[in-house]
Regions:
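An interfacial alpha-helical scaffold signature
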Residues: 2-205
């Protein structure tokens, strides 16, 4: 489960770049004053001037060939080879980035609020979204949503916006489960998601 006290700048995914090892230090000594970039696996590492979206990040070597800085690309767009699927929406891409250490949880919350999602309903034509009891935490209600049909395992779902879900759960202790049971799953209290999301007005400040 995601740890509670989160801020907009919190990272919930692992550090995405390879660790600095002897081979990387040797490469830095051989390329002083340059960035050592790590590209998407679909891109040939020897490609000159690769597109920015294909760069995962990198380390910078100073003039003495010492690694002194790193950079993680928050706009990295993983290929299907890297992600294991093709992202079908801006939210799905941001969710993948957040879970893999490229985007902050604040960026995720903003994307969730503006996303169109699939929410679980218990029968065709239902309009009310059922709160599912958490089998592991009695007394906790779960709200099940998916980022797309790619990750949806139930037949009955309705399209809703993330902002609608946040408004619906603002005064509850409901927990959001995004893409339950998949490799792109996240569990987060709805109240936490709402507190981290900026309104469109705030996003321009």
């Amino acid at each position: 489960m995601v740890q509670p006290q989160l801020t907009r700048d919190s990272m919930i995914g692992p550090y995405p770049l390879p660790p600095v090892d002897d081979a990387l230090r040797a490469q830095a000594r051989a390329q002083p004053g340059q960035w050592l970039d790590f590209l998407d696996p679909m891109i040939d590492p020897a490609t000159p001037n690769p597109p920015a979206f294909a760069v995962q990040g990198g380390y910078r070597a100073d003039e003495l060939g010492q690694i002194v800085e790193y950079s993680i690309n928050p706009r990295y767009e993983p290929s299907e080879l890297r992600a294991g699927f093709r992202c079908s929406s801006a939210f799905e891409l941001t969710l993948w980035r957040a879970l893999h250490g490229f985007n902050t949880v604040g960026m995720l919350a903003d994307a969730f609020a503006s996303a169109t999602l699939l929410a679980y309903v218990d029968h065709p034509g239902a309009e009310d979204l059922p709160a599912v009891p958490d089998p592991d935490q009695p007394g906790t209600s779960l709200l099940l949503v998916c980022s797309s049909w790619t990750f949806c395992s139930w037949e009955n779902a309705v399209e809703v916006t993330g902002s609608f879900l946040l408004g619906l759960t603002s005064n509850t202790d409901a927990v959001l489960i995004i893409n339950p049971g998949t490799g792109l799953s996240l569990r987060l209290a709805a109240r936490t998601m709402m507190s981290l999301a900026r309104t469109p007005h705030q996003q321009h400040q």
